[in-house]
Amino acid sequence: MSARTPLPTVNERDTENHTSVDGYTEPHIQPTKSSSRQNIPRCRNSITSATDEQPHIGNYRLQKTIGKGNFAKVKLARHVLTGREVAVKIIDKTQLNPTSLQKLFREVRIMKILNHPNIVKLFEVIETEKTLYLVMEYASGGEVFDYLVAHGRMKEKEARAKFRQIVSAVQYCHQKYIVHRDLKAENLLLDGDMNIKIADFGFSNEFTVGNKLDTFCGSPPYAAPELFQGKKYDGPEVDVWSLGVILYTLVSGSLPFDGQNLKELRERVLRGKYRIPFYMSTDCENLLKKLLVLNPIKRGSLEQIMKDRWMNVGHEEEELKPYTEPDPDFNDTKRIDIMVTMGFARDEINDALINQKYDEVMATYILLGRKPPEFEGGESLSSGNLCQRSRPSSDLNNSTLQSPAHLKVQRSISANQKQRRFSDHAGPSIPPAVSYTKRPQANSVESEQKEEWDKDVARKLGSTTVGSKSEMTASPLVGPERKKSSTIPSNNVYSGGSMARRNTYVCERTTDRYVALQNGKDSSLTEMSVSSISSAGSSVASAVPSARPRHQKSMSTSGHPIKVTLPTIKDGSEAYRPGTTQRVPAASPSAHSISTATPDRTRFPRGSSSRSTFHGEQLRERRSVAYNGPPASPSHETGAFAHARRGTSTGIISKITSKFVRRDPSEGEASGRTDTSRSTSGEPKERDKEEGKDSKPRSLRFTWSMKTTSSMDPNDMMREIRKVLDANNCDYEQKERFLLFCVHGDARQDSLVQWEMEVCKLPRLSLNGVRFKRISGTSIAFKNIASKIANELKL
């Protein structure tokens, strides 16, 4: 282990005071005075009118909401000085209790000291009296979870490339004496080059050798057996177990341990028996046996895992070794010169970098060192197109600026990055070589239009707040009780089966864990008031295409705790081999199976306690409080992930998988039926005529299934889509010429689903395709309605 980096520790059960981002006790945050620097003249090439009306936070122009939780929201934004895209997590501090604030600030402190190419970077922290803005790296490829759902299991070569990056990043955390404690497929993001980015350090903490931790953190399917037993732990060993579950999931497309309820899941984890698919190599199986070891003392360390044979196949000359953090580069004269032309003084640049202030100065320096955004025309923002900064008279309501940033880190390129490249790289609709200059006066973080939409949906759908999962890497907020809203499970893209997203909770330490886990009573979790963690957290860094926050989609209600009934399981007939038995041939598991009906192995609907991440402290505090956690969530093994364990296979998956392409989830607007949005009215046709025949669908680069493509005219395809939506009683709104925002189901029965349908053009082909993108709702409900619509479309 390397020299230990000083990190202020936070007692996980100390709730009397909360510590601010800089580590000082802060009963009341005093806003700082705005800078006295004079405004810089506008750049010649500047965007005016519409774009100047977009809301700003600091130097960031907010664009779309890509994640949403109870107490946080994640927005895609663009840094106006450099043009780089970032994810901004917006946390309402007034909704958090002292414990949650402590965890939030601890997360920020931890992220400031992490600088690894496979960990989401934190660029800037902007703090006001009521709100905390975390400006983070934007991972445009979405979550590994959604990638697996859409594409199925990875080949071992690809899984190895991803797993090497994951192990490198986690080992780096451990050598800095930081344990993540919430490693799962939902918290693993992909950047534009398909490299891993670990997100969501909301449950991370510092550990000290010899001092045990006792908080149960993590999603049950990924949780180590000692956590189910309520035992104290050192820290790294629980991450190692989670890595074993992740490796199994990457290679097989399903979870090694799952159950109909928490009791069954606990029993399976404590037995330590899991199925080995026939297609898994012996080397991979042997590696799993080093990771998924019941006795934490005998569990392999990550330094040992790095030397494993499977880890280094094809990399014999470059065996995986602990990551050595490069010396910070604070003397890049090219970047400094560019910043000087923007209006920054050299002294303030040096001061911000040397003292690691994580303010706008440091963020600008870091962002200049990152890959510039590319536009459809092939042009990118160059130094000649960068603009000078202008300081508006009022900025962020007397905000206190403190922002961390990460140095430019060389990307570790995935060995197989081209093999499964699917992310939608279509950039925002901004002309190439544009300079941003004038920053409009700070607007409200959320547009009035969005607020009106939220109110409208709440009115029409049983007073529920539509929550969309963010892709942020920011941390999950272990949140205080939300008194009012009830959020629908956040959005996640599922192309098939019911591989369910795991949410994050906190269970109190040993006493509460005894009730919740040792006795294996699932009701102890579903009935207990568990604080729902901001789902926006994980999505912070996640790509717009994937637009999901890595955290829970939560249904928080005020009132009595909710009892969740978990569906039963039917084991698939596909052949398998237990960890100790020989392999047996079976039908190819690569075939994804999806049916228009509910899948046969839906274990936990999304958001179920069993799929959620637990954090020990909250069960005890919240037993008398209304249930804030997400509703049930299906397991990875179920549905698409269960394809490795299920012999049945239909062709429907081919229709669905290709439709779930990562794309920025557009911020929802009116979901109710209106004459202007229904095909029964003649307005869509009139709109088509008015816009002219020259309008074309946007072109996306990804693989389409032939069953989702058509040579039909895009306008005719849109009419067919509206016709099928009407036939299935779906509400929708035409947000753009070829983009529909759709809603189906009943929020009171947890069946509400929101998604986008878009007609897109295939590059270099005279074909168009239909893109499905889930915004919110359970995987099963979304699969059912998406499959039904796909089958009924006559394209």
From Swiss-Prot:
The modification Phosphothreonine is found at residues 5, 208, 215, 613. It is found in: Cell membrane; Cytoplasm, Cytoskeleton; Cytoplasm; Cell projection, Dendrite. Keywords: ATP-binding, Autism, Autism spectrum disorder, Cell membrane, Cell projection, Cytoplasm, Cytoskeleton, Kinase, Lipid-binding, Magnesium, Membrane, Metal-binding, Nucleotide-binding, Phosphoprotein, Serine/threonine-protein kinase, Transferase, Wnt signaling pathway. GO terms for cellular component: cytoplasm; cytoskeleton; dendrite; glutamatergic synapse; microtubule cytoskeleton; plasma membrane; postsynapse. Inhibited by phosphorylation at Ser-219. Activated by phosphorylation on Thr-215. One of its GO terms (biological process) is regulation of neuron projection development. Belongs to the protein kinase superfamily. CAMK Ser/Thr protein kinase family. SNF1 subfamily. Residues 746-795 form the KA1 domain. The UBA domain does not seem to bind ubiquitin and ubiquitin-like and might play a role in regulating the enzyme conformation and localization. Activation of the kinase activity following phosphorylation at Thr-208 is accompanied by a conformational change that alters the orientation of the UBA domain with respect to the catalytic domain. Its main location: membrane. Gene3D superfamilies: DNA helicase RuvA subunit, C-terminal domain, Kinase associated domain 1, KA1, Phosphorylase Kinase, domain 1, Transferase(Phosphotransferase) domain 1. This is Serine/threonine-protein kinase MARK1. The modification Phosphoserine is found at residues 219, 382, 390, 393, 403, 423, 444, 475, 588, 666. It catalyses: L-seryl-[protein] + ATP = O-phospho-L-seryl-[protein] + ADP + H(+); L-threonyl-[protein] + ATP = O-phospho-L-threonyl-[protein] + ADP + H(+); L-seryl-[tau protein] + ATP = O-phospho-L-seryl-[tau protein] + ADP + H(+); L-threonyl-[tau protein] + ATP = O-phospho-L-threonyl-[tau protein] + ADP + H(+). The active site is at residue 182. SMART domains: S_TKc, UBA. Its cofactor is Mg(2+). Residues 1-40, 377-495, 539-700 are annotated as: Disordered. Phosphorylation at Thr-613 by PRKCZ/aPKC in polarized epithelial cells inhibits the kinase activity. Phosphorylated at Thr-215 by STK11/LKB1 in complex with STE20-related adapter-alpha (STRADA) pseudo kinase and CAB39. Phosphorylation at Thr-215 by TAOK1 activates the kinase activity, leading to phosphorylation and detachment of MAPT/TAU from microtubules. Phosphorylation at Ser-219 by GSK3-beta (GSK3B) inhibits the kinase activity. Serine/threonine-protein kinase. Involved in cell polarity and microtubule dynamics regulation. Phosphorylates DCX, MAP2 and MAP4. Phosphorylates the microtubule-associated protein MAPT/TAU. Involved in cell polarity by phosphorylating the microtubule-associated proteins MAP2, MAP4 and MAPT/TAU at KXGS motifs, causing detachment from microtubules, and their disassembly. Involved in the regulation of neuronal migration through its dual activities in regulating cellular polarity and microtubule dynamics, possibly by phosphorylating and regulating DCX. Residues 325-370 form the UBA domain. One of its GO terms (molecular function) is phosphatidic acid binding.
